[in-house]
């Protein structure tokens, strides 16, 4: 590394792993209410006979939650969300380049689209397998409607939720919805990582941007839109299935068929606007932060290794 400027030193796998988890947590802190609104809109209409609060639009959903459940309600499940990102994003984003390099044939100048898709599917599936319990708990908290300040709470806290689910539903309950989630996140990861990778590469090759904030912003925004379009149907099924009580759905396929029968095919795009607002904003914040963190961490590493 002698003679190289910090910005020229390729980031190590450890730097990418830690940087991705940290950047994802920062993005979650800023966009979590949008994710909660998405979950509420996705499960609305699931039980037609139930008397429940009706949500209209993203802002309307958040305002209704604040009015009926208190100002902290849009951040319900945040702790589990941060648990999720530290394990989930670190793997699916932080290991993407390493897995892509592993799949790329030796001597190849660059990775093909097929290789990038394969890498995205691989890290997405790996991440879900490790982080699924955190996602189940996050969704349960986000979907839990607690009217008034004295409303009943099923879980006393995040750790209690892990224990309660394992006790009442078995350890398998913490991995409920793993298959639809693997499908969803393989799709999301491909759309996000591959789209970001390709857009950024083309912008740099065409000299429209240098490798800086505008380039990262445009690439991340495009990645967020593509991810929302292709992943929304699976995301709705995943949310419904993970949040459902025992016995409501026999399988993710049964959940999907019941949705179509009761609500029509448009149900697959319930919560699309908050999904896009959240994924678009999340991607911009995460990728921009991630790129800067990689540079900062490598600068620290180079300065520590440099004798002068």
UniProtKB/Swiss-Prot annotation:
<dbReference type="GO" id="GO:1901373">
    <property type="term" value="P:lipid hydroperoxide transport"/>
</dbReference>
<feature type="region of interest" description="Purine nucleotide binding">
    <location>
        <begin position="275"/>
        <end position="297"/>
    </location>
</feature>
<keyword id="KW-0813">Transport</keyword>
<feature type="topological domain" description="Mitochondrial intermembrane">
    <location>
        <begin position="1"/>
        <end position="10"/>
    </location>
</feature>
<dbReference type="GO" id="GO:0007584">
    <property type="term" value="P:response to nutrient"/>
</dbReference>
<feature type="transmembrane region" description="Helical; Name=2">
    <location>
        <begin position="74"/>
        <end position="96"/>
    </location>
</feature>
<dbReference type="GO" id="GO:0017077">
    <property type="term" value="F:oxidative phosphorylation uncoupler activity"/>
</dbReference>
<feature type="topological domain" description="Mitochondrial intermembrane">
    <location>
        <begin position="291"/>
        <end position="308"/>
    </location>
</feature>
<feature type="transmembrane region" description="Helical; Name=4">
    <location>
        <begin position="180"/>
        <end position="196"/>
    </location>
</feature>
<feature type="topological domain" description="Mitochondrial matrix">
    <location>
        <begin position="33"/>
        <end position="73"/>
    </location>
</feature>
<feature type="topological domain" description="Mitochondrial matrix">
    <location>
        <begin position="234"/>
        <end position="267"/>
    </location>
</feature>
<keyword id="KW-0496">Mitochondrion</keyword>
<dbReference type="Pfam" id="PF00153">
    <property type="entry name" value="Mito_carr"/>
</dbReference>
<comment type="function">
    <text>Putative transmembrane transporter that plays a role in mitochondrial metabolism via an as yet unclear mechanism. Originally, this mitochondrial protein was thought to act as a proton transmembrane transporter from the mitochondrial intermembrane space into the matrix, causing proton leaks through the inner mitochondrial membrane, thereby uncoupling mitochondrial membrane potential generation from ATP synthesis.</text>
</comment>
<dbReference type="InterPro" id="IPR002067">
    <property type="entry name" value="Mit_carrier"/>
</dbReference>
<keyword id="KW-0677">Repeat</keyword>
<feature type="topological domain" description="Mitochondrial intermembrane">
    <location>
        <begin position="97"/>
        <end position="116"/>
    </location>
</feature>
<dbReference type="GO" id="GO:0032870">
    <property type="term" value="P:cellular response to hormone stimulus"/>
</dbReference>
<keyword id="KW-0812">Transmembrane</keyword>
<dbReference type="GO" id="GO:0005739">
    <property type="term" value="C:mitochondrion"/>
</dbReference>
<dbReference type="GO" id="GO:0001666">
    <property type="term" value="P:response to hypoxia"/>
</dbReference>
<feature type="transmembrane region" description="Helical; Name=3">
    <location>
        <begin position="117"/>
        <end position="133"/>
    </location>
</feature>
<dbReference type="GO" id="GO:0051384">
    <property type="term" value="P:response to glucocorticoid"/>
</dbReference>
<dbReference type="InterPro" id="IPR018108">
    <property type="entry name" value="Mitochondrial_sb/sol_carrier"/>
</dbReference>
<feature type="repeat" description="Solcar 2">
    <location>
        <begin position="111"/>
        <end position="202"/>
    </location>
</feature>
<dbReference type="GO" id="GO:0006631">
    <property type="term" value="P:fatty acid metabolic process"/>
</dbReference>
<keyword id="KW-0999">Mitochondrion inner membrane</keyword>
<dbReference type="GO" id="GO:1902600">
    <property type="term" value="P:proton transmembrane transport"/>
</dbReference>
<dbReference type="GO" id="GO:0000303">
    <property type="term" value="P:response to superoxide"/>
</dbReference>
<dbReference type="InterPro" id="IPR023395">
    <property type="entry name" value="Mt_carrier_dom_sf"/>
</dbReference>
<comment type="subunit">
    <text>Interacts with HAX1; the interaction is direct and calcium-dependent.</text>
</comment>
<feature type="repeat" description="Solcar 1">
    <location>
        <begin position="11"/>
        <end position="102"/>
    </location>
</feature>
<feature type="topological domain" description="Mitochondrial intermembrane">
    <location>
        <begin position="197"/>
        <end position="213"/>
    </location>
</feature>
<keyword id="KW-1133">Transmembrane helix</keyword>
<feature type="repeat" description="Solcar 3">
    <location>
        <begin position="211"/>
        <end position="296"/>
    </location>
</feature>
<comment type="similarity">
    <text>Belongs to the mitochondrial carrier (TC 2.A.29) family.</text>
</comment>
<keyword id="KW-0472">Membrane</keyword>
<feature type="transmembrane region" description="Helical; Name=5">
    <location>
        <begin position="214"/>
        <end position="233"/>
    </location>
</feature>
<feature type="transmembrane region" description="Helical; Name=1">
    <location>
        <begin position="11"/>
        <end position="32"/>
    </location>
</feature>
<feature type="topological domain" description="Mitochondrial matrix">
    <location>
        <begin position="134"/>
        <end position="179"/>
    </location>
</feature>
<protein>
    <recommendedName>
        <fullName>Putative mitochondrial transporter UCP3</fullName>
    </recommendedName>
</protein>
<dbReference type="GO" id="GO:0014823">
    <property type="term" value="P:response to activity"/>
</dbReference>
């Amino acid at each position: 590394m002698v003679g190289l400027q910090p910005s020229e030193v390729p980031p190590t796998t450890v730097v990418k792993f830690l940087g991705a988890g940290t950047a994802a947590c920062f993005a979650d802190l800023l966009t979590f209410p949008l994710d909660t609104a998405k979950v509420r809109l996705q499960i609305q209409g699931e039980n037609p006979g139930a008397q429940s609060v009706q949500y209209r639009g993203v802002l309307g959903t958040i305002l209704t939650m604040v009015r009926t459940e208190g100002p902290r309600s849009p951040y319900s499940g945040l702790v589990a969300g941060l648990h999720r990102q530290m394990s989930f994003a670190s793997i699916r984003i932080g290991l993407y380049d390493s897995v892509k390099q592993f799949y790329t044939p030796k001597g190849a100048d660059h990775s093909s689209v097929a290789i990038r898709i394969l890498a995205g599917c691989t890290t997405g599936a790996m991440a879900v397998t490790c982080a699924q319990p955190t996602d189940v708990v996050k969704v349960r908290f986000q979907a839990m409607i607690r009217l008034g300040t004295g409303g009943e709470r099923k879980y006393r806290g995040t750790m209690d939720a892990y224990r309660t689910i394992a006790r009442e539903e078995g350890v398998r309950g913490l991995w409920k919805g793993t298959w639809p989630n693997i499908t969803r996140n393989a799709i999301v990861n491909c759309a996000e990582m591959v789209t970001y990778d390709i857009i950024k590469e083309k912008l740099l090759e065409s000299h429209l941007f240098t490798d800086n904030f505008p380039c990262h912003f445009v690439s991340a925004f495009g990645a967020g839109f593509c991810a929302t379009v292709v992943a929304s149907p699976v995301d709705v099924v995943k949310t419904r299935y993970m949040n459902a009580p025992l016995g409501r759905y026999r399988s993710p396929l049964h959940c999907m068929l019941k949705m179509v029968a009761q609500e029509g095919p448009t149900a697959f795009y319930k919560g699309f606007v908050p999904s896009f607002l959240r994924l678009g904003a999340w991607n911009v914040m995460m990728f921009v932060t991630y790129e800067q963190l990689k540079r900062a961490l490598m600068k620290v590493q180079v300065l520590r290794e440099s004798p002068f």
